[in-house]
C-alpha cells in the first residue's frame, strides 16, 4: 500500500472529538478513526519533539545518544546520514518517499554553520527522502522559511539570510526591545520568545533577511496541504511513503482567518480545527486520485499537549472544561502519562477492519519494524534496534 504518516504537533490525548472532546469537533479525524482502528494506549517515544521524531524515523530510542534533545533552529542534522531510517527502508522496497512540514531534526552538518543562501547539506535526501519541503526549524524558532529539497523556497537574493542563536544583529528589531512591532502575537514572560520578529510575532533566535521567502504563520497549514496534495498527485501511479508533520497545534498559534474564532477556545482551539481541515484535504486528495482504499494512514502526535507555551493567545483563559490531556496527568515536557500518551489512528480500508478500538499498548518506535514487515523488507543490521513489529495487532 501507499503509506502516509500524519504527525500533529503538541496535540493531546483529549483534543479531538473521537477521543472524547466535546467543545471542539474534528469530523475529518473522526471519519478516519471510524474507517480503521483507534488506539487508546498509544505512546510517542518522548514528551518533546526532537527525540520523539528521531525515534520515529530511526527505530532507536533517543536516549541512546546525548545529542537528541530539543534542537535549536540552527542545529546540525540530528539523524546522521550513515543511520538507516524508515525512509531508507521504504526506498529499498521500491517506494517514492517524501517529507513535508514540521521536521525539527536539524539540517546541515554542524550546529550554527549553515549557509541558508545555498543548498544545506546533509539533509533529508541523505536520509532516504526523494522529496522534502520542511520548516527550516520550528514555528517559534528562526529561520522562518521553508526548505524545499534543502534550499530556501522562494529565495529572495535581495535579502540574504543570516541566523544567530548567540547574539542579535545590529539594527534588527527584537520582541524585547521593540514590542510595538508585535502586531499579531505577544510573547508570555520568561519563555524566550522575545528575539527576532517575523510576521509581527517574536521568536527564539536572531535572524535578518529572508524577504519574500519569509512565511506568514496563517498560511503554514495551507502550504503543507498544497505540498502534500502535489506529492500525492505526482506519485499517484507508484507506491509512496509520505511523512506529513503539521505545525498545528504548536506555538505560535496563528491560524488562517477562516478558522479564527470558530472554536470558541481561542487560537489553540482554532488550530485544532485547522489540523482537522488539513486531514480532510489529504483524504480528499487521495479520493480524487483513487488511492484511498489502498493507502495506509497513521495519524498521531509527536508528544502530549501544552496550553501556555510562550505566547499570549488566550489558550488558558478560554480553555473552559476542555481537557487536552483527557483524564491523564501531565503533558508536553512531562514524565507523567499525558506527556507521551497520544492519539493514534490506523486506517487502511482495503485491509483494516472499520470502527475498531484497541487498548493494546503500542509505541511509535514500533512503526519502523511494522512497516518493514508490511512491505516485506528485512531489517538491516543495526537498523531499528528498538522497534518491534505490531502488524499482528
Where are these regions (language model features)?
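Formylglycine-dependent sulfatase
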Residues: 1-391
